[in-house]
């Protein structure tokens, strides 16, 4: 009888009320009885096993919210600082500097460049051509006459000639330089022509000269022919040179 009454007493609504009264506000808590304490521990274990995922999720959510919120606030607060604003405006300035570096010829096309004392146009190596000086016939005659007298002019002479002809000293200097270069080319061409004519005259003289008389031929095969040729060659000079035998015969007679 007692065994059956204990489960009923456990399942009775009174014991359930005693258990739920433990979760009331702290000022209204009552001193628990031994029976209610046992029910409270069992209920806590049962409820903790079922409510553990919810507790973990709630704790994670509670931790995630404060962590995310100060991070956003820190970013928003730092965005108003001058350092962040300067960093945010840096890509625009970098792209502008890059566009200037990619197009370096924009400024060079508008200006002339002087390199090595030579005036260049657009920086592409094209020289600005000066206008060509046109000399009159009277000026050319006077310059040619002076060039026949001397090929090099001193500074006073050049200044005097330029003033008399209405030219600048630079124009007179350039004309004399060009005239000297042309004169040297003509001299070189004339020297080559003289050498060619001398060679032609030498060949003509060698062709008109008499033939050389044939001498002794060492390559002749017959001894008779060689003796005859030597005999014909030697007697022609015996009249000029006396033989050694005749000189030996004359010496005993004198003694």
UniProtKB/Swiss-Prot annotation:
SUPFAM superfamilies documented for this protein: Homeodomain-like (SSF46689)
Start-end of Basic and acidic residues biased regions: 100-112
InterPro entries assigned: Distal-less_Homeobox_TF, HD, HD_metazoa, Homeobox_CS, Homeodomain-like_sf, HTH_motif
Biased composition (Low complexity): 25-36, 217-232
Expression tissues: Expressed in a restricted region of the developing brain, within the diencephalon and the adjacent telencephalic regions.
Residue numbers spanned by region Disordered: 1-38, 95-118, 204-233
DNA-binding region, residue intervals: 128-187
GO biological process: cellular response to BMP stimulus; cellular response to transforming growth factor beta stimulus; cerebral cortex GABAergic interneuron differentiation; cerebral cortex GABAergic interneuron fate commitment; embryonic skeletal system development; forebrain neuron differentiation; GABAergic neuron differentiation; hippocampus development
Composition-biased stretches (Polar residues): 1-14
Broad class of the protein's primary localization: nucleus
Sorted UniProt keywords: Activator, Developmental protein, Differentiation, DNA-binding, Homeobox, Nucleus, Repressor, Transcription, Transcription regulation
Compartments where found: Nucleus
Single GO term (MF): RNA polymerase II transcription regulatory region sequence-specific DNA binding
PROSITE patterns: HOMEOBOX_1, HOMEOBOX_2
GO cellular component: cytosol; nucleoplasm; nucleus
Gene3D superfamilies according to UniProt: Homeodomain-like (1.10.10.60)
Pfam families according to UniProt: Homeodomain
Oligomer and partners: Interacts with SMAD4 (via homeobox DNA-binding domain). Interacts (via homeobox DNA-binding domain) with POU4F2; this interaction suppresses DLX1-mediated transcriptional activity in postnatal retina and enhances retinal ganglion cell (RGC) differentiation.
Similarity comment: Belongs to the distal-less homeobox family.
Domain notes: The homeobox DNA-binding domain is necessary for its nuclear localization, transcriptional and erythroid differentiation activities.
Known role: Plays a role as a transcriptional activator or repressor. Inhibits several cytokine signaling pathways, such as TGFB1, activin-A/INHBA and BMP4 by interfering with the transcriptional stimulatory activity of transcription factors, such as MSX2, FAST2, SMAD2 and SMAD3 during hematopoietic cell differentiation. Plays a role in terminal differentiation of interneurons, such as amacrine and bipolar cells in the developing retina. Likely to play a regulatory role in the development of the ventral forebrain.
Protein name: Homeobox protein DLX-1
């Amino acid at each position: 009888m007692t065994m059956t009454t204990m489960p009923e007493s456990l399942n009775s609504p009174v014991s359930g009320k005693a258990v739920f009264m433990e979760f009331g506000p702290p000022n209204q808590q009552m001193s628990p009885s031994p029976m209610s304490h046992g029910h409270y521990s069992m209920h806590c274990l049962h409820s903790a096993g079922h409510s553990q995922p919810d507790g973990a999720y709630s704790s994670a959510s509670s931790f995630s919210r404060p962590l995310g919120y100060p991070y956003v606030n820190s970013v928003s607060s730092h965005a108003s600082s001058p350092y962040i604003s300067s960093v945010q405006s840096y890509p625009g300035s970098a792209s502008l500097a890059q566009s200037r570096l990619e197009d370096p010829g924009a400024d060079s096309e508008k200006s002339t460049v002087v390199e090595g004392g030579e005036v260049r146009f657009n920086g592409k190596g094209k020289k600005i051509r000066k206008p060509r000086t046109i000399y009159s016939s009277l000026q050319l005659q006077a310059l040619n006459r002076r060039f026949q007298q001397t090929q090099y002019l001193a500074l006073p002479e050049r200044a005097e000639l330029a003033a008399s002809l209405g030219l600048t000293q630079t124009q007179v200097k350039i004309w004399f330089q060009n005239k000297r270069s042309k004169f040297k080319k003509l001299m070189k061409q004339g020297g080559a022509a003289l050498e060619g004519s001398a060679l032609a005259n030498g060949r003509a003289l060698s062709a008109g000269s008499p033939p050389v008389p044939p001498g002794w031929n060492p390559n002749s095969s017959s001894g008779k022919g060689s003796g005859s040729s030597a005999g014909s060659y030697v007697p022609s000079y015996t009249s000029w040179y006396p033989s050694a035998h005749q000189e030996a015969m004359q010496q005993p007679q004198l003694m």
